[in-house]
Amino acid sequence: MAYNNSVRKRKKDIQDANGFHRDQTIDKKSRATNKLEESLPTFKVFIVLFFIRLLNSLTIKTFFQADEYYQCLEPAYNFVFGSGYITWEWEEGIRSSIHPLIYALGYKMVSYVHFDDKPIILIPKVIGALIASIGEVYLYKFSKKFTKNEKLARLTLILSLLSPFNWYIITRSFSNSFEMVLTTIAFTYWPWDNVISYKDISMSCIIAFISCIVRPTNGIIWLYLGINFMIKNYKLEKQSGKLMKLILILSIELILILLVNTGLDYIFYGKTTFPLYNFVEFNVIRNLSIFYGVAPWHFYLFQGVPIILMTYLPWLLHSAIVLKKYKSLLGQVAILMIGGFSLIDHKEIRFIYPLQPIFMLMVAYSIHETKHKFQRLYKFLVPVIIILNLIIAIFFTQVHERGVIDIVQYLRNNPDIESFGFLTPCHSTPWQSHINNPNLVNKSWFLTCEPPLHLTTTSLKEIKSYRDESDQFYDNPAQFLSEHFQSFADSRNTGASNWPSRLIIFEPLENFMDDFLRGSNYFECERFFNSYFHWDDRRKGDIIVYCQI
């Protein structure tokens, strides 16, 4: 009997022990689950994101598009130092000053200190990293608010960080990148549940109004969301009074923002001008935007969206089609914006970049819904996708089109250069915002591409018949050079020359220039790798520098 009691006691002890360990395991899982459901601390997230995006920004060695410099850094540099290159857009006043003024503030800070060239190059990168990291903090907040799911919010943030297109463009000084960040912030405060909250809606619309001033086409998003919100609340009883109050508040906000913006534009331009009206007149009334290229209606479907998404594209398609997220309000916004931009003749990939927060969230939805069903496949796919994204990001930020940045560093760091000229398509490189040498302002030039501003209305036929300076050169390089420069014989006889000490070309012109310069005092002195391929045949291959003896 004593033996049986002893056995029972031992069994009970074992059961108690097993139960304790089991409860411990449950407690651990419960704590882990609770921890995963807790929101991440905003400041810590921002600090981590800022250092990631600062690394991103500081390591970019390549060129993407000219607007990164000529629609932001050059006018900002000119505002502070007086020698940035001002394109026709700023002469005509079709751009808001808000975006370049942010960078001008950075330039102004470093102007108070005696410095070398490095801070001038670095300060825009720091500002770009700051803007990007704020945007991704709000991407996390927006995803959490919209889905009410912490795991989805974190996944959306991770996808954004691992996106090769984001790594390529998000920290650059494009107004589209700034627009995307503003859109994400405004999304965060938007009442997706259609509940009237004066505080949140006011904050959302303040950011949305600024975004539309920076990029007027962003209004497509906010007109649709606003109309949708009004209709749904109008149908509810006893909401008309609240709606009228909301409309009054937002009207006052808009008027105040427009007044402040007009003041900023006056300070920046030195005169009273209305960029929003000028933008509409240039792009809509006169339709001069087609001067910069016309793309087919399906450009965004088959080029824009796939390039922005890259390796994430299958998950976006799954989310939109299989999970039917195209029916959601965010899906409707994306469809409307892509459809609206598809109707505009002039198209560029970055024009739909403000849809990136929607794309990232839809991709996260797809992964969240399929990861358990295809668990074994994901164990293989995840590292493959990460590696592919890294390869793409490294190639486009370190290799593709790095020569046009290297040549500017060469010009900046070589004190023996007295003058230089670019026989290349217009705006192929940054200018004074990177060269930072006021002594060379009047001794340097590139071929320009001013649009036909003299035309009051424009047809595609008229645009094709118009030849800007770059076109004139590439139509007949020999004739252009003969008309604009002294012959080498005349230069030797008179002892004077309007030829620069450095001539820079892209590789496709190499054979012509070698023949044209034969017998002159020029020789090839430097060559920089630029690209293996390029959408513009004139920009393929290396950058070549001819030095004058």
From Swiss-Prot:
Protein name: GPI mannosyltransferase 3
Segments traversing the membrane: 40-60, 120-140, 155-175, 206-226, 247-267, 290-310, 329-349, 351-367, 380-400
First-tier enzyme category under EC: transferase
EC number annotated for this UniProt entry: 2.4.1.-
Pfam family of the protein (one): Glyco_transf_22
Gene Ontology cellular component annotations, sorted alphabetically: endoplasmic reticulum membrane
GO molecular function, one term: alpha-1,2-mannosyltransferase activity
